[in-house]
From Swiss-Prot:
One of its GO terms (molecular function) is nucleic acid binding. Gene3D superfamilies: 1.10.340.70, Ribonuclease H-like superfamily/Ribonuclease H. It comes from the Eukaryota. Residues 113-270 form the Integrase catalytic domain. PROSITE patterns: INTEGRASE. The gene is GIN1. It comes from Bos taurus (Bovine). GO terms for biological process: DNA integration. This is Gypsy retrotransposon integrase-like protein 1. It holds the Pfam family Integrase_H2C2.
Amino acid sequence: MVRSGKNGDLHLKQIAYYKRTGEYHPTTLPSERSGIRRAAKKFVFKEKKKVLRECHENDTGAHHGISRTLTLVESSYYWTSVTNDVKQWVYACQHCQVAKNTVILAPKQHLLKVENPWSIVTVDLMGPFHTSNRSHVYAIIMTDLFTKWVVILPLCDVSASEISKAIINIFFLYGPPQKIIMDQRDEFIHQINVELCELFGTKQIVISHASQTINPAESTPSTIKTFLSKHCVDYPNDWDDHLPAVSFAFNVTHLEPTKNTPYFQMFNRNPYMPESSDIREVDGDNTSMFAKILDAIKEADKIMENKTTSVGQMENNNCHELNKSKIIVKKKPKQQNPFHLKVGHEVLRQRKNWWKDGRFRSEWVGPCVIDYITENGGAVLRDSSGARLKRPIKMSHLKPYVRESGEQDSLHLLHGSVVADHDYVGMPELPVGAYQASILVEDAAIGVDDSELLTSSKDRELLEYRNAKISPLMEDHNALEKQTFSLLDSSNQVLEYLT
């Protein structure tokens, strides 16, 4: 048990100072020297690694995380830098770095808010359908997110020029919106934006669905998609002639949560509709096409409402049962540390198709050294033997490799011999001990500089001597060349003298 001083604090700093230097700390009182000498006999710094290894590794072969390892260490041992030492030990564990799989979390999505009619619309493509008499095969559906107003137009194909012409025709009727959200690849959206800029003068009005998150209930209703698919099968030759009637019938019948139709939401009034008998009776007992479409859409709405009600009741019952049996605990999502990798950093690379070999196969291979960075952002690596890998690796498939503090001294000379003869395209090389703190973000606090890990005066002198000897070898390549040429000249003179 370590005695406390007059102020009640432990003499850990004084004991460590006496243990390393053999002298008393300047703040040590004369009355405390005997207690510090006795306590220093019980302190053995070499046992710290043994304690960390025993607490980190389980008897079954499993490796604990930071919190569990720290709990086990603090239950039986104590020293001043126990938290930082545990973090450094866990992050530098070879088994944990290679065996731990990456957990990629989707970024937090913010729902898009729409406050005005015809400000933000979505565009969906449907088809291919049966070729109509006018050679139409596809259909484009434009839906206003605020009013749910729907416009449907036929298309001959799904090229960027054909879609742009259809969008321009809708612009001439209702005006251009602020944004158009489309679920297509970025290259195709770029082509549509170029076509719209040439035809109408708008720039970057169409955006990707991935860049903006919308509520699924605000997108194109599934009712109209289901109805349109069935209607095109029932009328394979003239389905494109009925698209204006389908969109109008949907806009005047589909009720919103506000109990208003999309037509009323769009124009702030209801359209003039003739009597139902006038709509249905045309030329005697024949029913008009619009009346058939209107009845079919109403039936489809009723079916969807019944399905939604039944599904909602089942979900509520399931949630109620789960709430009774379980207590939901809200957990904070894990945060990924963004890595800033540069030339000279030691990294682990992700194994290609590692999941096909079984879940017990390690995901990461290494360590490797970043030789240089290509113009496309790929990293060319060298393995531990100094051989360069054939293909560049994406930065997203790399993560920093953390070594123990004792391994960094011998590793620095290896890095110099491997990468000193190469002209870098990317950033200049860095010493091994210095780059670990710059790779990781500040919140992680797992990279520690060599000067912070080496606390004794002898270790600091060794570090300064090592940096003083290595830095000329890493930086001044011209000096090495001059020395080499001077040795060659002297050897040539000796050979001439002998001959």
